[in-house]
């Protein structure tokens, strides 16, 4: 469980930046330093690597649960299929059909869909909490690799398949699938490292293990373009004296063909510029809602 210790006076804290105070746990401080500097995941000890991966999986798990709960609440009392499927990508339905065929191997779906009596009977079977809950768990695990067990109250909802479709099209769903599929692959390590960085600092802030001063959010909002987590990591590196440890140097060809426009934030480590074409395409797919099934 993600218990907060922000208000616990017994937890000692140390200043880790101009805008941050972190609990004085040696392991947390050691991982935070490596995460802020963008060191390769191979530089982490096995103990540290297990902790980082466990936290990422935990956050994905809780995030998917929260998103499904939100969509279920939004769909309460709605019976219009056009409204229910407005945020459901088209590739979701073939995947759901294959999942239903595996759940009901002896059922003639073509006959059940066009016969009201059989359709009503199938709907009653799908409303059974154990059956629908297992269907949800298998679908999410098949596409993300995460064994998420949803509460029976969610599985009992009549619009749960539409809520699941919205979850399928969400970027967090694709990010979880990307993380579990490419964890440990050297070609994707720079991208997995960026995910671990953001997840780690989100976990520290969310659980109260790192306290951020209120003025940090005001300064970040007006002067920073890459988000609060990158802002906190830069502040962490500045305080530790490692901000320029890996300066970003553009390629000479990029300097010759430079076009005016807003600067793109560099990745956190020089190795991130050596991504394979497959890794680049996979990263771009994370930003395309219609390509959720391709991640």
From Swiss-Prot:
Residues 245-261 have a biased composition (Basic residues). The keyword Protein transport does not apply. The keyword tRNA-binding does not apply. Keywords: Host nucleus. It is found in: Host nucleus. Coiled coil: none annotated. One of its GO terms (cellular component) is host cell nucleus. Its main location: host cell. Residues 243-273 are annotated as: Disordered. InterPro entries: Herpes_UL79. Belongs to the herpesviridae UL79 family. Plays a role in the expression of late transcripts bridging viral DNA replication and late gene expression during infection. Functions concordantly with UL87 to initiate transcription from over half of all active viral promoters in late infection, without affecting host transcription. Acts on and binds to viral early-late and late kinetic-class promoters. This is Protein UL79. It comes from Human cytomegalovirus (strain AD169) (HHV-5). The lineage of its organism: Viruses, Duplodnaviria, Heunggongvirae, Peploviricota, Herviviricetes.
